[in-house]
Swiss-Prot record:
Cofactor: how bound: Binds 1 FAD per subunit.
GO annotation terms (biological process): polyamine biosynthetic process; polyamine catabolic process; spermine catabolic process; xenobiotic metabolic process
Induction (UniProt): By antitumor polyamine analogs.
Record keywords: Cytoplasm, FAD, Flavoprotein, Nucleus, Oxidoreductase
Identification of the protein by name: Spermine oxidase
Biased composition (Basic and acidic residues): 274-291
Gene3D superfamilies documented for this protein: 3.90.660.10, FAD/NAD(P)-binding domain
UniProt tissue specificity: Widely expressed. Expressed in human tumor cell lines. Isoform 4 is only found in an embryonal kidney cell line.
Amino acid sequence: MQSCESSGDSADDPLSRGLRRRGQPRVVVIGAGLAGLAAAKALLEQGFTDVTVLEASSHIGGRVQSVKLGHATFELGATWIHGSHGNPIYHLAEANGLLEETTDGERSVGRISLYSKNGVACYLTNHGRRIPKDVVEEFSDLYNEVYNLTQEFFRHDKPVNAESQNSVGVFTREEVRNRIRNDPDDPEATKRLKLAMIQQYLKVESCESSSHSMDEVSLSAFGEWTEIPGAHHIIPSGFMRVVELLAEGIPAHVIQLGKPVRCIHWDQASARPRGPEIEPRGEGDHNHDTGEGGQGGEEPRGGRWDEDEQWSVVVECEDCELIPADHVIVTVSLGVLKRQYTSFFRPGLPTEKVAAIHRLGIGTTDKIFLEFEEPFWGPECNSLQFVWEDEAESHTLTYPPELWYRKICGFDVLYPPERYGHVLSGWICGEEALVMEKCDDEAVAEICTEMLRQFTGNPNIPKPRRILRSAWGSNPYFRGSYSYTQVGSSGADVEKLAKPLPYTESSKTAPMQVLFSGEATHRKYYSTTHGALLSGQREAARLIEMYRDLFQQGT
């Protein structure tokens, strides 16, 4: 897009007046994750020249975090490309040679599934026993049948019996238990094992949905999340390579690192003719959750505008710089919005959007990597899954803080060892993950080693030589891993979260001042990397289309 001229002299709205003076709209993107980079790149490719990306942390990538240890790359954040057919992340990775060559058989398997017979997942009890393979397969088939039923409530508009039953966890637990108890062929001992396995599978589901518990995931909305067909893939060189490819077309000066935002002052033009409508702040009014750059009661300092200029939005940064803009694309996580929405936007958000932020869910899923000198597991083993026999009748997935380790569902074996060494990757989610994040490495390594000894029945397992783990819940720039539709929410809330501000159209009010993207704003693909990327492109497309309609290209 070249510099723009109004298509009619009568246009006197704020955007038209600004463009007559400047020729280009100014867009500020908050966040340099997949959504933010995708939005910035799309705008730049369409000729927008006044684009700035503000990233709070010291690096781009957001919830993509690839860590190099020795010759191997480990993913603390996004790990898999979920599906291939029409997945923009997959096509970007494939076009740039980032994917491994796989056989047809490997393509059909995709990533290791804990719910299938592919590979050898070792299900172990806290008494040091391995659950027989036939019992695991029977339970897996049963669980999959019930899992498919959970999809039908949304897809076939099936009514939920009661609001208290509008929970994936409650429905699944009760349905699977009833089928196990009513099976005339299983002896009581086998039934007890299968009943205990329910909780383990629900822990895995909770990790995959990034909820504290599947009891908190809406049954009526669960089936709206859409899986892209095709195999799941990892990127051996690291998921950050996708981020780097996105950033390649973005000039270095566009992205500012270490630049946390304190507040977005929007609807400025309709409130006063010029200058930022920013009230002085005291200590009590300062938002303390936006990182270390906070300046307390320090007065904001002037930003990048002429005093005679008029801007709809002013972005106030933690270093007190004020950046005026025509449009701001907000890509911060739902966790950050939940924690900071009251102080992050002035004026405050509309009631409808606040309600959507409250209703939608986001939790923490963390990984624990343990590296050993030698493997203590067999070459055929692809994972060690932990089944607590005393949880056969349990109705909760919440544990006291001192028992946080019970939420670890198991450890996957990273393959091949030639690439990773002898490494196990553990999974934990929810409030228990937050407790784990507060522990030091030594304590977590010790507890995990004791669990491995207990469940394998091998007291001689040594402590790992190295531990690496994520901490998404306590990171002030994320406050969680990814979103889900919580009980009481629906896809309509995702749409409300994504709706640009202001809601009303007026000749005195500039449109699309604040736009929202990020995985939590994609109705079908929330929680995924492709959902994040597509949401960034979606918001860029809104602006591209608006300026295409409002203005003709200049020469």
